[in-house]
């Protein structure tokens, strides 16, 4: 199941770029982004049904966009209808057709689609939901722009609800490992000494992405993480007292995210070749 922005007629006229059927192409796009980037969610009808009927949990579905491939060699791009026969005679170009790309996830409140989260926020959502399978985290190392890429191979999340007086806190702990995938212009010269600082930057970036998603969901008053459902299962007495007001309480709860990802080795990174 997926949602697409825009007119239904435009979506129905979309063309597959690599597969024989558009439905197969959509399935492959979502699947690849789930497995290799953790920037998409896989939602079937059963999960939508559960999100609609289970208290303290909202529905999240893949969000697709229509776009025209920029590559001139794309099979769905249109050229002129025929070669020009003279300098002054030229057939008009046909309009370019469009296909789908993943653009994040659609957020529901009850049975209504209310907003979107982008791919980076979707990755934060997937990490907290313990559904991440792998992905790339770019960080800025001694620079204002992101110049080093960390690829995580495993990621595990543990969520614990804590009642501190009248304050409800959800403590999210993330753990995982991976390696450095790429660096720009050889910014890291001595991995043995700079690795601790690099791990710190990676964990800060992961925490930032997760917290941005939490803040967005709280602004929307949509508990896409199922924190309420978790509280219902682990501390039912507390849940019974606040269940009717959860949509108003959720934006006020505190969510702490702590990431502990380990850079196991430097992967394929190396110092750039120098021309002498």
Set out the residue ranges of the language-model regions.
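A glycine-rich, acidic short-motif signal
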Residues: 1-276
């Amino acid at each position: 199941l997926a949602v697409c922005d825009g007119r239904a007629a435009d979506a129905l006229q979309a063309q597959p770029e690599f597969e024989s059927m558009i439905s197969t192409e959509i399935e492959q796009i979502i699947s690849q982004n789930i497995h290799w980037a953790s920037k998409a969610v896989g939602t079937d009808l059963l999960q939508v049904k559960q999100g609609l009927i289970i208290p303290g949990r909202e529905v999240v579905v893949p969000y697709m966009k229509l776009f025209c491939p920029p590559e001139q060699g794309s099979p769905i791009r249109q050229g002129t209808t025929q070669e020009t026969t003279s300098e002054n005679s030229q057939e008009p170009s046909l309009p370019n057709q469009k296909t789908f790309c993943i653009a994040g996830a659609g957020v529901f409140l009850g049975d209504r689609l209310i907003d979107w989260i982008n791919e980076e926020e979707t990755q934060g959502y997937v990490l907290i939901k313990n559904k991440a399978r792998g992905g790339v985290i770019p960080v800025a190392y001694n620079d204002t722009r992101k110049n080093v890429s960390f690829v995580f191979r495993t990621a595990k999340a543990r969520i614990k609800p804590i009642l501190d007086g009248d304050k409800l806190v959800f403590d999210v702990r993330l753990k995982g490992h991976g390696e450095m995938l790429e660096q720009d212009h050889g910014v890291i010269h001595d991995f043995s000494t700079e690795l601790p600082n690099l791990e710190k930057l990676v964990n800060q970036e992961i925490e930032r992405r997760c917290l941005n998603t939490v803040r967005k969901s709280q602004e929307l008053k949509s508990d896409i993480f199922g924190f309420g459902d978790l509280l219902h299962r682990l501390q039912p007495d507390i849940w019974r007292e606040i269940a009717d007001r959860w949509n108003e309480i959720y934006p006020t709860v505190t969510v702490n995210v702590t990431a502990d990802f380990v850079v196991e080795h430097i992967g394929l990174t190396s110092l750039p070749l120098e021309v002498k």
